[in-house]
Each structure stands twice: as structure tokens, then as C-alpha cells.
Amino acid sequence: MSGHSKWHSIRRTKGVLDQRRGQLFTKLARDITIATREGGSGDPEANFRLRLAVDKARAANMPMDNIQRAIDRGLGRGGSDAAALEEIYYEGYAPGGVALLIEAATDNRNRTASDVRATMTKNGGSPGEPGSVSWMFETRGLITIDLSVKRLDPDEVMLIAIDAGAEDVQIEDDIVEVYTDFKQLAAVRQQLIAAGLPVTGAEKTMIAKTTVQPDTADALKAMRLIEKLEDLDDVQKVYSNLEITSELAEQFVSG
């Protein structure tokens, strides 16, 4: 499985998410600010992208004061300048020919570009030109269902998701990932909630059209590079076309 939950599980097993909660809150706040500005509203009920960002922040136990400050920044309140915050993408390759699409939120393009470039070159990667790998990915909606919250038959959950309009459903342990056409994300999410499923997250994601499986040594190097990129303050997410098998995940965590 090459899905979001596999990588998220690896990061949690290594203790990264808990150790760097302050950095996580900063990244979540940027998501909220950009969602507020782009959606033109500070009301999550009227701004679906903002609702998703706020839900994600709440799931991470981000304080409501922090959430409201991020919304205020997006609305230009309090003297803050949300216009300086840009959502941009960088592209390149990791060892083994693994394609990387790096999503960043920054108020200083030069700083972020320099940090991304340096991290890639120091860890066996190669920065690419705009468009060099983005064509390998497609925009999708991703809805996460946690069966540890409410015990349900995974096969039944899969059927409900497909009936609701899911394009693909992947199951990893207690986590069910439901992939949708991005334009249908809100509608599918609402149907799953109405069906009583424990929806714990919904977001935009980028899915590789095809995945690659380099040799183990290069795959581990690619995963280390992805981890280092995600640790950069300005980087929000890193998408790749690396197929992460259970065996590879175990080696990465133990290494």
C-alpha cells in the first residue's frame, strides 16, 4: 500500500508527530489561513476548504485560540498580512527515481526554495523544473475512516463508500482511506457521515498515476529524504510515487 495512512503510521511509530507538535500546529495554522483567504470567508460552514482545515486542526488537538488567530490572519485582521503567505509546489526526484511533489506554504519564496533544494541535494535527491513530475500525479479527495473508533466490518464500510461515490478504497489495519473525485469530496464525506461511519479526516491529496518500487536501499533513502523534507518548517506535505510495502515500512522504522 502506498497510501497516506501508511506513511502517517510510520511517522507516528517513530514518535515524530508527538515530538514536533509545535511545528505541526504552525503548519495547520497556515492551512487555515490560506483556506480562509482563498475561500473568502472565516465561517467553516460557508467555506468547505476551511472546514476541512479546521477539522484537521481539531483532530490534532490544536487550541481554539490558535485556530481563531489563523482565521483572523486569513481575513487580514489584527494587522497580520495573509497576502504574504503563498501556497507553492516544488518538484524533483529522490534516490531510485522516486518522483516527489512538495507542497509548501511560505512568506518567503527564496528561503523555502533554498531549504528544499539544499535538503534534496544533501540527501541524494535532485531538484526538478516546474512540470517535471507534477504530470505524474492527479488531484483527489481523501476521506479517512478510523475503525478503532467504531468497530465495523471493513467490507461493509467499503461497500458503503463505493455506493457513496468513492473511486477507490484502501484498508490498512484500522484505517480506511476513501479516494474520491476532488469535486465530490464534500458530497461523499457527508454521505459517509450520514451512514454513521467514523470519519476522522477529509482533505485534498495528490495521487501518483503509477507507483515505483526501487531496490530496498534506494527506497529507504527516498523515505529518509521525504522525512527530512516534511521536517522543513515551510513544507506542508510531500507526495511521492513510492510504493511502501509493509516490509519496507518495518525496515524504515527499525532503522
UniProtKB/Swiss-Prot annotation:
HAMAP family: Transcrip_reg_TACO1 (MF_00693). One of its GO terms (cellular component) is cytosol. It is found in: Cytoplasm. The keyword Flavoprotein does not apply. GO terms for biological process: regulation of DNA-templated transcription. Gene3D superfamilies: 1.10.10.200, 3.30.70.980. This is Probable transcriptional regulatory protein Rcas_0718. Keywords: Cytoplasm, DNA-binding, Transcription, Transcription regulation. It comes from the Bacteria. NCBIfam families: PRK00110.1 (NF001030), PRK12378.1 (NF009044), YebC/PmpR family DNA-binding transcriptional regulator (TIGR01033). InterPro entries: Integrase-like_N, TACO1_YebC-like_2nd/3rd_dom, TACO1_YebC_N, Transcrip_reg_TACO1-like, Transcrip_reg_TACO1-like_dom3, YebC-like. Its main location: cytoplasm. Belongs to the TACO1 family. One of its GO terms (molecular function) is DNA binding. Signal peptide: none annotated. The keyword Cytoplasm applies. Disulfide bonds: none annotated.
